[in-house]
């Protein structure tokens, strides 16, 4: 069966009252970005549902693109026919014939919002159900648990028919809750944190710290590939790759070994916060899970967070490693994350890092080095790329005026 549209049902958008239009607009933008390589597709957002007019595009590809987009409760491949009973009968029969299996069951569920249509909902159920039964011999009715549920929606603009309902990703449209910077390493935790933030409507821009020659191009590519996995949920993720070699080398030379990790994280957070300010972000997201490593004790978090007053969102803070791994496997980032390429969080790691660093001592150690100049230099040399769900494209000079 050739479907001509996708019918999208909203998730939590149904509870958003006066802000509903804003949420629908944001969802439409995300769907459009996810369909960038399907230029023939047209998107029409309405108060209670959204239609994607395929115009000949591959509906199966469109279906795959819709599944991970947050803000969609469910969707159905559908066909539209005119407000003509015979056309409805023909389309209904074709849909059920295509969907049913031998000795299967079905039901018709009609809804008529267009009152000028000559039959009411019950009459449509009876008329279409009888027509289908007369033309498919091995089919019976089961109104409680049918193998095939034919939905018919009679509206002023036409009659819409579908036989499948596919669960969406639910949540809120990415971007509806504002923008945040995701500190994206090559590990397991930060992509999961990015996924969970997006599910609550946060638009993420990834920040990755790259320290060649200590970290390889493969490590950089792994981070880009992880960002591409996250782009599925919004259509696109902006990624900022920060040159971090010089800062790490200075830290290694000037800072006591036991607090190298703490100072490194503080510099990362300062750079991320400056990017957030320039990009009009509202928060920073990271993959910290309380107590997993030395830098993730409450004392370490306190010392690291002291460089900023910006809200830090930690979606996985209370999860154990197995819980995080389960989500990573679900969103298809786990196999990428465990590839054995070093990132800058693992180089120069001391054998016995302090788990309870003192903020006053950390600030004292830092005071002997002009980290402000090093941070400004790193910001001036950031590489920004746009990671798209369909392809990865390097962005040249797109944010030149910001740095």
Swiss-Prot record:
Residues that hold ATP according to the record: 183-184, 208-209, 265, 287, 296
Substrates-to-products reaction catalysed: [ThiI sulfur-carrier protein]-S-sulfanyl-L-cysteine + a uridine in tRNA + 2 reduced [2Fe-2S]-[ferredoxin] + ATP + H(+) = [ThiI sulfur-carrier protein]-L-cysteine + a 4-thiouridine in tRNA + 2 oxidized [2Fe-2S]-[ferredoxin] + AMP + diphosphate; [ThiS sulfur-carrier protein]-C-terminal Gly-Gly-AMP + S-sulfanyl-L-cysteinyl-[cysteine desulfurase] + AH2 = [ThiS sulfur-carrier protein]-C-terminal-Gly-aminoethanethioate + L-cysteinyl-[cysteine desulfurase] + A + AMP + 2 H(+)
UniProt cross-references to Pfam families, sorted A to Z: ThiI (PF02568), ThiI_fer (PF22025), THUMP (PF02926)
Keyword Cytoplasm appears in the UniProt entry: yes
Cell compartments where the protein resides: Cytoplasm
Superkingdom of origin organism: Bacteria
Keyword terms: ATP-binding, Cytoplasm, Nucleotide-binding, RNA-binding, Thiamine biosynthesis, Transferase, tRNA-binding
PROSITE patterns in the cross-refs: THUMP
Pathway(s) where this gene product acts: Cofactor biosynthesis; thiamine diphosphate biosynthesis
EC number: 2.8.1.4
Keyword Mitochondrion (UniProt): no
GO biological process, one term: tRNA 4-thiouridine biosynthesis
GO CC, any one term: cytosol
A GO molecular-function descriptor: ATP binding
Domain THUMP: 60-165
UniProt family annotation: Belongs to the ThiI family.
Function recorded in the entry: Catalyzes the ATP-dependent transfer of a sulfur to tRNA to produce 4-thiouridine in position 8 of tRNAs, which functions as a near-UV photosensor. Also catalyzes the transfer of sulfur to the sulfur carrier protein ThiS, forming ThiS-thiocarboxylate. This is a step in the synthesis of thiazole, in the thiamine biosynthesis pathway. The sulfur is donated as persulfide by IscS.
Protein name per UniProt: Probable tRNA sulfurtransferase
Organism: Listeria monocytogenes serotype 4a (strain HCC23)
């Amino acid at each position: 069966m050739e479907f001509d549209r996708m019918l999208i049902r909203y998730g939590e958008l149904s509870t958003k009252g006066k802000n509903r239009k804003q949420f629908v607009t944001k969802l439409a933008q995300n769907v459009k970005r996810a369909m960038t390589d399907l230029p023939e597709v047209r998107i029409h957002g309405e108060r209670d549902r959204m239609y994607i007019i395929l115009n000949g595009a591959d509906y199966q590809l469109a279906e795959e693109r819709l599944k991970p987009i947050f803000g969609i409760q469910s969707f159905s491949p559908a066909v539209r026919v005119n407000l003509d009973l015979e056309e409805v009968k023909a389309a209904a029969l074709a849909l059920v014939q295509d969907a049913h299996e031998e000795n299967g069951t079905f039901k018709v569920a009609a809804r008529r919002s267009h009152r000028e249509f000559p039959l009411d909902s019950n009459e449509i159920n009876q008329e279409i159900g009888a027509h289908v039964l007369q033309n498919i011999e091995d089919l019976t009715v089961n109104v409680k648990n049918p193998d095939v549920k034919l939905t018919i929606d009679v509206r002023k603009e036409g009659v819409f028919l579908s036989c499948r309902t596919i669960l969406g990703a639910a949540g809120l449209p990415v971007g509806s809750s504002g923008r945040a910077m995701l500190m994206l390493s090559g590990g397991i935790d930060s992509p999961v944190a990015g996924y969970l933030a997006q599910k609550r409507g946060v638009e993420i821009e990834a920040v990755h710290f790259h320290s060649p020659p200590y970290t390889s191009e493969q490590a950089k590519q792994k981070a880009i590939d992880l960002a591409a996995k996250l782009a599925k949920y919004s259509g696109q993720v902006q990624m900022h790759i920060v040159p971090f070699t010089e800062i790490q080398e200075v830290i290694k030379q000037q800072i006591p070994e036991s607090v190298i990790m703490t100072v490194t994280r503080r510099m990362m957070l300062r750079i991320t916060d400056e990017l957030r300010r320039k990009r009009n972000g509202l928060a920073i997201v990271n993959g910290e899970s309380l107590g997993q490593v030395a830098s993730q004790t409450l004392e370490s978090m306190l010392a690291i967070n002291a460089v900023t007053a910006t809200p830090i969102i930690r979606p996985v803070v209370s999860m154990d490693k197995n819980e995080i791994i389960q989500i990573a496997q679900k969103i298809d980032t786990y196999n990428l994350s465990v590839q054995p390429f070093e990132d800058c969080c693992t180089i120069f790691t001391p054998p016995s890092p302090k788990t309870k660093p003192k903020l006053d001592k950390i600030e004292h150690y830092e005071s002997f080095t002009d980290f402000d100049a090093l941070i400004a230099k790193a910001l001036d040399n950031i590489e920004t790329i746009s990671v798209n769900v369909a392809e990865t494209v390097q962005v040249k000079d797109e944010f030149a005026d910001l740095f």
